[in-house]
Amino acid sequence: MLFARVVLFGCLGLGPVAGLRAAEERPAVARYTTKAAHDRDGIGKIYFGREIAQVMGHQGASWLERPERQTEERTDVLLDALALGPGEVVADIGAGSGYFSWRMAQKVGAQGVVYAVDIQQEMLDLLMSQMRRRQVGEIVRPVLGTVQDPKLPAESVDTILLVDVYHEFDFPYEMAQAMIRALKPGGRLVLVEYRGEDPAVPIKRLHKMTEAQVQRELAVHPVQFEKNIPTLPRQHILIFRKPRE
């Protein structure tokens, strides 16, 4: 949830702080529209009828590491659903504090690689400090991405994981294209998003997505929707796969 301009606790409504934007950001192309009167939790930029949400900044890292997160989100169940194996190459997009990077490193082991991608150097510095302390610094590789490109090697990754981050991309089309280029043939793109269909999920509206909306946005890219794993209490696990040929 941290692939970001600097905005503190955007999804909880705790108030934005002054933001930064990547230097290469270009004016919106035809696929995007804007509106001046927009949701206080959004940036006024519209994609497929959806307003893009504000993003949490590095000041919110402690919230990602809160002790109750596993109970609330059942992150252990998510990791089991991914079924990662030794030696796999995976990417954690919007890695933030490294909550999932560390856990995935334990799954892929010493022969595997975890690319921890974020656009905030401060977050990557914090993340790698924790990875070295947890003795997985040789497995987890920090990558400073941009708002349009995660900077991953082409056709190098088995699984790309995005946990509560896709809805905050300034350039969702460009990011999806770049991530798919980074996937090996047959690789998986996994989007975990709070369920927009469920009003009982206690998250701001713009920080949730329906399965239909995600499928609509990914349908324009060269991936195939595979399944929605309905095992989490609040979130979708949406699996897309890059064709093998």
Residue ranges: model-predicted function:
Residues 91-150:
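Class I SAM-dependent methyltransferase SAM/SAH-binding core
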Residues 25-91:
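Class I SAM-dependent transferase core
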Residues 188-215:
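Conserved class I S-adenosyl-L-methionine
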Residues 87, 110-112, 183-189:
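Short glycine-dipeptide loop
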